[in-house]
Amino acid sequence: MIKRITDVADLRGLPPHGTEAQKIRSLYNAYGAGYDFCRFYRAESCFISVLDNSAVVCGECVDTEELRGFLLMCGVSDVFCEAGLADNFCPPFSRSDVNLMRFCGEISTEISHSVPTLSEAFEILKTAFSIDFEPWYLDMSHRIRHGVSSLAANGASCLCVQYDLNGEALLSQIATLPEHRGKGSAKRLINSVCASLPNREIFVLCEDGLLDFYKKIGFSFVERKAVLLR
């Protein structure tokens, strides 16, 4: 049976490490259990977060038919989960895998980035991602205000530290202004951010087309993750 999480105690049993677990944990740290647009659920050892129409599933679910029906009932349009779990949801979802990469390169001792305003960050991000300002601003400002996420920039490039939890950090929304692409700006920013996060395992999720780029700047492949779309 899938039950809604109403208290942090209900998260006991959520693994301390792993991308899915940290995505759910960081989302709970930002929003808690009191919003209808951001909900958390549990089915034994399976944990689920639903933010608007996006879901994250962590752990094996005994009744995958129930879980699939539940996600459809919630009206989710995309699901992030372990690759091994994904086939249980296809159809009606279609599957598009991404790559989890871990930074293994030599970390510079120089910290050269700054913290941009949300508007400054968006001016860079909008050149690489199809995102609307208002929902992005509301979510990002909330995460930053609650100490869950942070932004970093160096004038030409920008990125988000989506979470920094239990010795693991995930970099996301990495973008460079068109006129500065191919000049090493993103690499310098990533190295600077990694230098500011000592003693962490630092990860990024990327599509196949960016594998070579991340390998060149010091990331190594860890595993495939599934993104399910509807």
Residue ranges of each PLM-predicted region?
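Acyl-donor-binding surface of acyltransferase catalytic domains
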Residues: F47, D52-H113, I202, C206, ...
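Conserved acetyl-CoA-binding loop-helix of GNAT-fold acetyltransferases
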Residues: D63-F70, T176-P178, G182-S196, K216
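Recognition helices and adjacent regulatory flanks at domain boundaries
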Residues: A152, Q162-D164, S185-S196, L205-E207
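Helix-turn-helix
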Residues: L210
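A mid-sequence, solvent-exposed acidic-amphipathic segment
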Residues: S119-A175
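Short amphipathic alpha-helix that is part of the acyltransferase structural core
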Residues: M1-R25, D97-P135
